[in-house]
Amino acid sequence: MAKKSMIVKALRKPKYKTRQKNRCKLCGRPKGYMRDFGMCRICFRNHASAGLIPGVSKSSW
């Protein structure tokens, strides 16, 4: 879990666009961010396996 201060800091609009850092909307993790879903890979995996993300299923071949 990210510190609350870091999450609040990331939510503020930066002075320059290049300073913006994408963070997971659920846990605040800055790395492993998936832009299409707005969450990190760990939260994505948990939600996908629980069936909370429509249209996403575990692949097998």
UniProtKB/Swiss-Prot annotation:
Cofactor: Zn(2+)
Superkingdom: Bacteria
Segments crossing the lipid bilayer: none
KW Ribonucleoprotein (keyword) present: yes
InterPro entries recorded: Ribosomal_uS14, Ribosomal_uS14_bact, Ribosomal_uS14_CS, Ribosomal_uS14_sf
A GO CC term assigned to this protein in UniProt: cytoplasm
Residues that bind Zn(2+): C24, C27, C40, C43
Pfam families: Ribosomal_S14
BP GO annotations: translation
Family label: Belongs to the universal ribosomal protein uS14 family. Zinc-binding uS14 subfamily.
Subunit field text: Part of the 30S ribosomal subunit. Contacts proteins S3 and S10.
NCBIfam families according to UniProt: PRK08061.1
Record's protein name: Small ribosomal subunit protein uS14
Organism: Borrelia turicatae (strain 91E135)
Lineage: Bacteria, Pseudomonadati, Spirochaetota, Spirochaetia, Spirochaetales
